[in-house]
């Protein structure tokens, strides 16, 4: 309710800062092409340290294309900060929990925290094929909606199909969760770190 969302609305979450390399105009184009006024685009973060010019352009772009855009940065506090009270009781994790679909159409990323967050919260995901995704993530076999630099009617149709089919959506996110747990869990990280310490220092940390 803090974001003006009501029962029956469907939340498309863009869980990133509003900076040019995030390709947020693609998320706007997606919502526009879904052609359903119940779909609302929610951006979780503020513009950050790259200025507000792109953020203003994004707001105008959404308005021009008839997309209901909600900006949540005033209502969300970081889940990593140990605050006595979250602002209005919301953290980024609350927003993920209530999202129906996640967009991550970045032009380039180091890795992409939002990708793993979507897997953890079992949310279907649209992702652009940025270089590190192609090299490091795509070969793992995730079931994703993938765009290659631009949206196509086929991409939009698949998103619509996923949003309208709870069975398809559940199969997709459960599959992705298993793959993410196999390759990116804390248990995997511990094994990798232990191997590094053993190889370099002869120390077994298990």
Where are these regions (language model features)?
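Conserved donor-binding/catalytic core segment of Leloir-type glycosyltransferases
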Residues: 5-22, 28-31, 41-43
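Nucleotide-activated donor-binding/catalytic signature segment of Leloir-type glycosyltransferases, i.e.
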Residues: 52-94
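A short alpha->beta transition loop at the rim of the catalytic pocket in nucleotide-sugar-dependent
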Residues: 100, 122
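Short hydrophobic beta-strand element within catalytic cores of glycosyltransferases
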Residues: 104, 124-128, 137, 144-145
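Aromatic "clamp/platform" in nucleotide-sugar-dependent glycosyltransferases that forms part
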Residues: 107
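Short glycine/serine-rich donor-binding loops of glycosyltransferases
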Residues: 112-115, 133
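A charged, aromatic-enriched C-terminal amphipathic alpha-helix characteristic of glycosyltransferases
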Residues: 164-198
């Amino acid at each position: 309710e803090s974001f003006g969302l009501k029962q029956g609305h469907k939340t498309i979450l863009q869980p990133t800062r509003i900076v040019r390399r995030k390709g947020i105009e693609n998320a706007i184009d997606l919502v526009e092409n879904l052609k359903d006024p119940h779909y609302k685009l929610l951006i979780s973060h503020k513009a950050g340290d790259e200025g507000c010019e792109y953020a203003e352009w994004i707001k105008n772009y959404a308005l021009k294309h008839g997309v209901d855009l909600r900006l949540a940065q005033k209502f969300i506090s970081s889940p990593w900060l140990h605050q006595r009270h979250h602002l209005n009781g919301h953290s980024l994790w609350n927003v993920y929990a209530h999202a129906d679909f996640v967009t991550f159409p970045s032009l380039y990323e180091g890795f992409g925290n939002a990708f793993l967050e979507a897997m953890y919260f079992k949310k279907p995901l649209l992702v652009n094929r940025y270089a590190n995704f192609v090299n490091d993530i795509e070969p793992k076999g995730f079931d994703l909606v993938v765009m290659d630099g631009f949206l196509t009617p086929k991409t939009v149709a698949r998103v619509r199909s996923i949003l309208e089919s709870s069975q398809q959506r559940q199969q997709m996110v459960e599959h992705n969760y298993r793959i993410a747990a196999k390759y990116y869990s804390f248990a995997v990280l511990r094994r990798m770190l232990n191997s590094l310490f053993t190889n370099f220092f002869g120390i077994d940390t298990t």
